[in-house]
């Protein structure tokens, strides 16, 4: 087993990474302080893993809330539904929520945990690659609004993160590829040696080799834990984790949440960001090509939808959370392993990039 720690003083918490971890409830039970917990999951994950988690915790009474699967359900209606269910179950402030699912379930459950009676404990059990390497770690919780992604939310840390790499065996190939976009992101923004390792292990990762998966997930969580410990509330360094997301969120909003997977939109966004880096004279053509080749190797899109140009992007990006003092901030790579936050992408450059 790999055990990491997100170091946030008294709010520090562990990340456990191991195949078949879901069957080992004794460890999970250590983080549930009462004899009652509520499992929040979706209708795809529920028949696959809910009973395994419940059976592994025989001494704890577990109730279940199941919502429909998909990004289109990460909204205030689902948030209200979960709150209503908790109230009808007489959940209390010390009841533990268990988020079992991908990024939508983790983000939604975390936001409910932050809000219900002003804060209740929650545990993340991410079952998709994207949530295992990114959204389950770091305490960003949110739901979407029709005008923008993750517009309503809170910073609220879990008590622990349990990553069972075996859950990836039931993940559709398209979802696995989408998760790889976030894995690649870490190499581009922070670790050129990890990027090179990914280039050398494409076949092993696609085949879901146990050791390759364990290493890549652990390395991503390690990088994220390091960044979050330095900058929990995204005032500086943590913003680098949004590489590809400014463009990506615009693609998701324009296409309708769920029509492009989050990771697919981020992949296309990272290519745009790398090309912007080249246009600024920061990134070499060779490195941009390496980024494109690695993204393509995992069957991910390397360009936005053909119907999206400068005007459409700008219309959505005006609502982006990275707008500060009226200026839109972008995360742009200067080289593989090195990225910056910049507002220096002018209209001429953006038109040339997007039209």
Curated annotation (Swiss-Prot):
Which pathway is it part of? Metabolic intermediate biosynthesis; chorismate biosynthesis; chorismate from D-erythrose 4-phosphate and phosphoenolpyruvate: step 2/7
Q: Which UniProt keywords apply?
A: Amino-acid biosynthesis, Aromatic amino acid biosynthesis, Cobalt, Cytoplasm, Lyase, Metal-binding, NAD, Nucleotide-binding, Zinc
Catalysis performed (reactions): 7-phospho-2-dehydro-3-deoxy-D-arabino-heptonate = 3-dehydroquinate + phosphate
Q: Name one GO biological process term.
A: amino acid biosynthetic process
* Entry's family note: Belongs to the sugar phosphate cyclases superfamily. Dehydroquinate synthase family.
Please explain the role this protein plays, according to its UniProt record: Catalyzes the conversion of 3-deoxy-D-arabino-heptulosonate 7-phosphate (DAHP) to dehydroquinate (DHQ).
Report what the protein is called: 3-dehydroquinate synthase
């Amino acid at each position: 087993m790999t055990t990491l720690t997100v170091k946030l003083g008294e709010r520090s918490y562990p990340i456990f990474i191991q195949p078949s971890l879901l069957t080992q409830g004794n460890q999970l039970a250590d983080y549930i302080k009462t004899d009652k917990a509520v499992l929040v999951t979706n209708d795809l994950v529920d028949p696959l893993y809910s009973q395994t988690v419940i059976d592994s915790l025989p001494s704890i009474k577990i109730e279940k809330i199941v919502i429909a699967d998909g990004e289109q359900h990460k909204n205030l209606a689902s948030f209200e539904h979960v709150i209503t269910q908790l109230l009808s179950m007489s959940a209390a402030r010390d009841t533990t929520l268990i988020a079992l699912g991908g990024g939508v379930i983790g983000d939604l459950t975390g936001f409910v945990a932050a809000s219900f009676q002003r804060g209740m404990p929650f545990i993340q059990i991410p079952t998709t690659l994207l949530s295992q390497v990114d959204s389950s770690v770091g305490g960003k919780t949110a739901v979407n609004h029709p005008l923008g992604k993750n517009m309503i939310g809170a910073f609220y840390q879990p008590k622990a993160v349990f990553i069972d790499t075996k859950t990836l065996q039931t993940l559709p190939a398209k979802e696995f590829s989408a998760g790889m976009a976030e894995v690649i992101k870490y190499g581009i923004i922070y670790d050129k040696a990890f990027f090179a390792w990914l280039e050398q292990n494409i076949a092993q990762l696609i085949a879901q080799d146990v050791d390759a998966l364990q290493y890549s997930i652990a390395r991503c969580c390690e990088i994220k834990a390091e960044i979050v410990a330095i900058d929990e509330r995204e005032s500086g360094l943590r913003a680098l984790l949004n590489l590809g997301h400014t463009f990506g969120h615009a693609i998701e909003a324009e296409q309708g949440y769920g029509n492009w997977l989050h990771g697919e939109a981020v992949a296309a966004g990272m290519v745009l960001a790398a090309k912007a880096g080249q246009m600024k004279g920061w990134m070499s053509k060779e490195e941009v090509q390496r980024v494109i080749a690695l993204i393509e190797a995992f069957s991910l899109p390397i360009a936005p939808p053909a119907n999206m140009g400068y005007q459409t992007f700008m219309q959505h990006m005006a609502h982006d959370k990275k707008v500060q003092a009226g200026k839109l901030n972008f995360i742009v790579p200067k080289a593989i392993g090195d990225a910056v936050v910049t507002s220096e992408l002018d209209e001429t450059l953006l038109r040339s990039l997007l039209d």
